[in-house]
Amino acid sequence: MSDDYDPTNINAASWEEQEDYGEADGSEQYGEAEGSEQQDIQHSSEHQEAEYSVESNPNDLGDHPSQDGNTDDVGDDYDPASVVTSSVPAPPSAPAQEDSKTAPQPAAPVAKKPRTAGGFLVGDSDDEDEDGDDDGEPQQQQQQQQQQQPHQVVHKETGSGASSSGGSAPAPASASATAAPQSHSPAPQTATLTVQDNAGATTFNAPPVPQQVSHQSGATTAAVPTTPSSAAPAVDPTPVTQPAPDRVAIYEDQIRDDPRGAMNAWLELMKEKRARNDIDGARQVYERFLAIFPQAADIWVEYLDLELSLNNFPQAEGIFAKCLMTTPNVNLWTRYLDYIRRRNDLNDSTGQARQTVSQAYEFVIDNIGLDKDSGKIWAEYIQFIKFGPGTVGGSQWQDQQKMDQLRKAYQRAICVPISNVNTLWKEYDQFEMGLNKLTGRKYLSEKSPSYMSAKSANTALEHITRGLNRTNLPRLPPAPGFDGDQEFMEQVEIWKKWIAWEKSDPLDLKDDKDQPGLYQKRILYVYNQALMALRFWPEMWVDAAQWCFDNNITTVENKVTKDGNANGVEFLIRGIEANPESVLLAFKHADHIESTYPIEENDEAKIQRGEAVKAPYNKVLDTLYAMIKSLKEKEAAQIAKLQEMTAAQESKAGSDNEDGDGAADNIKKAPIEAIQKGYAAQTQLLSRMISFVWIALIRAMRRVQGKGGLNVPLGGMRKAFHDARARGRLTSDVYAAVAQLEWTIYKDPAGGKIFDRGAKLFPEDENFTLENIKYLHSRDDHTNARVLFETVVNRLTQKPELVHKAKPLYQYFHKYESQFGELAQVTKLEKRMAELFPEDPKLAAFTARYASDKFDPITARIIVSPTTQLRPKNMIMPSIEQQQPQLPMSQRDTPAAGFSPRPQGLKSPSAGPGAPFAPYAAKRPLDDRDYDDHPRKIARSEHDPFVRGASPLKGAAGRRLDQQRRMGGAAGAYSGSGAGSQVAPIARDITFLLSQIPRVEFYDSHRLNPSRMVSLLQNVKVPEYLDWKRERERMQQMQQMQGDGYGGYGGGGGGGGGGGYQGGGHARNISQDYAYRESPGPLGGRPLSPFTGGPGSRLASATAAYRQAPVGRPESSGSYEPPPAAQYGVPPPAQYDGGWAQQQQQQQYGQPPAPQGYRYGNPPPPY
């Protein structure tokens, strides 16, 4: 076949007829075709540059000539442009716009009086004498003209079409677009509303319009003047407000431009139709919408409500027939149940109606009873059975039948993970135990595992679907990086988690023999639910189809069978209908057809198989080509609209704007170029999509039908390549792929000719040139490879904007010369690369000589000294404050000392009167800026440095502290020293607490909100010292008064600091733990406890022996002190008002003395 195949010539049949390949290609014909194509597009070289239009760029698209004009090809009759059918003619301009452009528009300068007739401008006078004559016109004539104008408009609307005056003049060019049809064709007296769009005209008849309404509506229509233009002077006409555009027309325009993306326009249009009581129009809108969104259950429900509100039961049943089986939605199926119950009266004596409703319930539960939101339907079904004929527990056959139906319904419902499964289980328990406790326990024990599985599954399902939006109004997925992309992908991930959870079989249904196929049915149901929300996400369609193929699963009449092809293909077909532009779905469908189609050796079977495989490819190609055509139409419309607006602005400005023509032209061209660039980017993306679809089709045809040819029944690969060139919009990838197939598989020299043709079409495509050089190297044609390399890189480097394209060519050729060439050639290439790409590292090219894709011997480091080169870095454990992100600097003022919730300590003598207090005798003056914002353990080097004074500690403690500071020990963290400082160790109690807290990945309980916890601690009210002292004294006085009423305390305290009773007193002595509890007052003047003897004291004299005893508090913060034994003593009898209340009262206000030797900062504030 290599002798008679010309891949570059569409019409030629053999290579022998065209021996001059590469020398003559009919450039004259191509030039004519190219000119004709440009004529169709109506893009002039003076106003539009080629690089802004992908269609006119020969370097990026299909079979087009090179820029140098050389279009060598095989045959004289070969015309690549003649087979490219992707050119889009410019849309014809509207007649009204043509009139506005061709008709003369008189100018009306401000300084001159315009000449008008009938309220419209008809001329302009530059002569002062004429203006004087106009001023002499009587004012009555103007009033008569103004009175006659509405009358003429009414006549035009009522169909007379003739003016009362004899003369008539054409309407001025500035008239609105709606005036043209009124002036040429009379309108009927009955008003007709016509909404005109590209799809057609939709006409709605309305009642006759009164004449007054016509008069008002016709005020904006150009009236026929009754007098000549020079008759009356011009009085400035009052500006007439244009009527607001019809909302229906606006919504229709949005839907026409973007039917799948204008969801809000669809919804508003339906709402508007219903508000206007336009039933027929609403039906049409519903049908159009549901053709695009066939699983929009909410819109189906609205459509049903519309028909049922009009009692159109046949139409409602037709709607149910269309949507019920394809839309598994609980709300929609609930409406079906409501309709069945509405049409069947349960009071029927024959019982036929109840039987129909019962069958409807069974039908609904079989289809959507698996839904996690179907609990209401299950509950209604059980109630329907309960209120049926018969008595539960009776002995009649009807009673027994009712009992069996209830038991069956309960046993089915409690196995489904629904929200009310607990309620249904309780009802089932009562039902069984009410009949017979012995048999009831048996049934309950049998169904208890299923119920527990359903209960736990419902909990897990609620956790998985938290945040899921189960919408049935799908939206197009936002592009990555644009608004809504993260939210959309989050919804996709939640659906995937739900599907994966169902596949994990949490209900143990895979091996359930009582319910065969229920496991597969649940998974298919979740896939259908996901596709209702993700209709425009092709990956979900492919995932569902692939699962059916892998598991050989499908459903026939709601029963699972073992024929997965039907259901999987159905998913693919439905996905392609929803996403006709999806390349993924097309490839998957074609791949499945190719792998499952029967294989036979005869030519007829191969032809049929090839046609079946080509069908998905052709469908997606048609869609992509149509999208490019639509883009070109939108581009032309936007440019025309922009030019029209620019022209209107220039006409308003007049001749006052006399700026330079060059600057004005640049300003006008800038927005047009921006529009062209935007559409060019979209068109380029679609062109690459089309090219890769053609590559996939060519490869598939080679597998199915072989190499093929143009004039043979089995076209194969070559016929597919011919069709691709005929349709156009190809990139260089197609030529490179076909050439590689020709040479790699068949060793046919046609591959080289395809490369030659591609080199002429894409002379500046670096990727295609790179593949061409590799092809020449594979044929050992090193000379031509070098020539091609030098030619292309010289062409690219001559243009500064294309220098970057030469880099991959240099890199490949440098690598090739390094491996197989001479050192002199390698050195020359490196010098050229250094001049062209100075930003690259100097050793990058030299290193690339000896490196491979797997290892680079130059950059790899050899370990000479492990002790020196492999020394681990010092890992310093950061403090708690360093582990947390640094808080921003506070913007508030430091609170005053008197209002601070901290314990009020003594101020430093060196501190000024306005300085904040230093808790517990600070050793140095503190900075008064942002005192509360610095973390306790933050490195002071990050803030203002300070000089620490001499330590007030003397003796051994002072020497130890000074030694630690000199050695850079723990004290360095507080002194703000440099790198030698170490972080202060964490207290043992805190370390123990942190060790008990589980790791975050293993903690699945309730999590505290840190910000709210900090806010709670900030809002805790800590009393001031003076207020606390005053309150304590008041409570002491109250306790003394109560003690005086019960009698005094005697001596002789009990063991363990308890104390004894004396006289009529009933209060026992307070233990030592609370007797020495102090207030959070200043350390300098520590008050004595009021409970330690003295006049008026209520304590027994035995407690005085413990006054001078040292406080039994440990010095270490990590030690533990057991409570005194008196705390665990036996309380006094209940009938006596003993000492427990007093002990609790003292416990509320008393505090133990704070230890003086805290090692890690100040003691905490009081409780």
UniProtKB/Swiss-Prot annotation:
Molecular function terms from GO: mRNA binding
Biased composition (Acidic residues): 16-26, 70-79, 124-137
Record-level GO BP terms: mRNA 3'-end processing; RNA 3'-end processing
Biased composition (Basic and acidic residues): 924-946
SUPFAM superfamilies xref list: TPR-like
Chief location of this protein within or outside the cell: nucleus
Biased composition (Low complexity): 102-111, 138-150, 159-191, 219-245, 908-922, 1079-1090, 1135-1151
Extent of Pro residues compositional bias: 1121-1134
Keywords annotated in UniProt: Cytoplasm, mRNA processing, Nucleus, Repeat
Positions of region (Disordered): 1-245, 882-980, 1075-1167
Domain of life, source organism: Eukaryota
Keyword Lipid biosynthesis: no
InterPro entries named in the record: HAT, Rna14-like, Suf, TPR-like_helical_dom_sf
Cell compartments where the protein resides: Nucleus; Cytoplasm
GO cellular component, one term: cytoplasm
Repeat positions for HAT: 277-309, 311-342, 352-387, 401-434, 471-504, 518-550
Biased composition (Gly residues): 969-979
Record's compositionally biased regions (Polar residues): 192-218, 882-893
PANTHER family from the UniProt entry: CLEAVAGE STIMULATION FACTOR SUBUNIT 3 (PTHR19980:SF0), RNA CLEAVAGE STIMULATION FACTOR (PTHR19980)
Biological role: Component of the cleavage factor IA (CFIA) complex, which is involved in the endonucleolytic cleavage during polyadenylation-dependent pre-mRNA 3'-end formation.
Name of the featured protein: mRNA 3'-end-processing protein rna-14
